[in-house]
Each structure stands twice: as C-alpha cells, then as structure tokens.
C-alpha cells in the first residue's frame, strides 16, 4: 500500500495505472500481456499509462508518449516506439532521433513540432515527474491500483491487480 495514496475520481471506476519506460525490456515484454489483460477488464476499470521520468532521456520519451496521445496514434505508434528501441536497438535518445523516428512513421514535422514541445505536453510531462517522485517509482513496469496499491511487475502481477481491483470495487 502506498504511504501517500493518490486521489482518484469517485465515478465508480477503479483506476489502474501502468508506469513504464519505452527503453525497459521488462516493459516491452509486459506490453502484450497488458494489452490482452486490458481487453478483458470490466467496464468499471479505467486503465491508464504513464511514462516514468527519472532523467532527461526518460522525460524525452515521456514527451514522445504524450505527443503520440495528443495526435491520437497510440494504437500504432506506441508499439512502433517499443519495436524501434528493442528490435532495432535505437534508443531515441535525442530530439533529432525522435524527429527522425516520427518522420519514418509518417508524422509530419509540422504536426510533431505542434505537439512535442507544446505547453500541454510539457505540462503532462511535469505531472509525470511529480507522480514519479510522489509514488516513489523505483522500478518499471509498475502498476498502481486505485491510487493506493503498488504492484511490481512479476509473473503474477496481473492476477494481483485483478484481486485489488475487485477488492476496491467492493469497497466503493
């Protein structure tokens, strides 16, 4: 249980937050499991992702994540970033590398520049920085259930998440 639980919406939903990093091999391996799990979750589960922001490369990757969300291309580009980093061994560690990546996947430089360094994306990255500290994220992937419970990625992580989701649902 978290020392300082996060406030969650009181809309009858149980929030599940996955904290990840594109460059993490464990996060990449867990991605297909998370996708499959998310397809089977009840309607009262609200699933979200948040990039970890420990250092400058993590913050750049967080800006990529929020840019991808802003242009509405999560379904295609999220997997493409993971693939580029893990299959092509291109860590995308500079803004120039990120720009080249987006160009290769068909995002125009004008669309990219509209979002990557925008106020909205910067604000979301800053919020991720705050939450990374507040939640004391020391490894990824990590899953937070309803702002209260921290689940480290292990083989049984999603079963643990299911248990906690049901427990939280019965408490609401």
Protein language model features and the residues they cover:
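Extracytoplasmic thiol/disulfide redox context detector
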Residues: 1-56, 126-129, 133-134, 166-172
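Alpha-helix N-cap/helix-start motif
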Residues: 27, 57-58, 91-94, 125, ...
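Solvent-exposed loop/turn segments at secondary-structure junctions
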Residues: 23-26, 53-57, 84-88, 121, ...
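A structure-centric signal for secondary-structure junctions around beta-strands
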Residues: 11-13, 61, 139-140
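Structural microenvironment flanking redox-active thiols in thiol-disulfide oxidoreductases
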Residues: 40-71, 75-103
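C-terminal cap of thioredoxin/glutaredoxin-like
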Residues: 104-172
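Extracytoplasmic/secreted envelope proteins and their assembly/folding machinery
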Residues: 31-38, 61-65, 78, 95, ...
